[in-house]
Amino acid sequence: MSEARCHLPMLGARAAGSLRGDDFHETPRVAIEALLKVEDFDGPVWEPACGYGAISKVLEAHGIPVVSTDLVERGYGQGRIDFLMEMGPRAPNIITNPPFKLAAEFACKAASFSPAKVALLCRLGWLEGKSRRLMFMRTGLARVWVFSGRLPMMHRVGWAGKESTSAIAFAWFVWDRDHYGPPELGWLP
């Protein structure tokens, strides 16, 4: 990742912990499995929005050591750790499904740590926008892995309504310290 500072206008006021906790959706296992088929992670991974451990558990099942933290205490990993306030990385790689409203802030914070790799699961539409274009350029986005099909719906925890598939396209956005050149585009099943 580029060591250049990420000067991104805040896309709204920084949300309070209680609001950020409400933007919690479990990551489908198929999303993490797909990432691991196309990206290698050398060394431990920090999952800074671990929730109940959906990403962490899959990584551990693949033999990847994980440091799991979350702003909200959910009984998995270390709670009450605000990734956006951390002063340094807890592992050489970062993989997470960030709160959507704070995805840009998560990307900029991760870039400030200059990790080996960062992978953020975000809506494909997150790629759009002038300020995000500048952020991607300044932080050295390496690859975008687009899901060919829709991921299973990531319902909010506690959702009691009908289960359904998602109408939203998702992608893994990957920053790689060893990548040079423009971002590459690839597809996942």
Model-derived features: positions:
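Class I S-adenosyl-L-methionine-dependent methyltransferase catalytic core
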Residues: 1-189
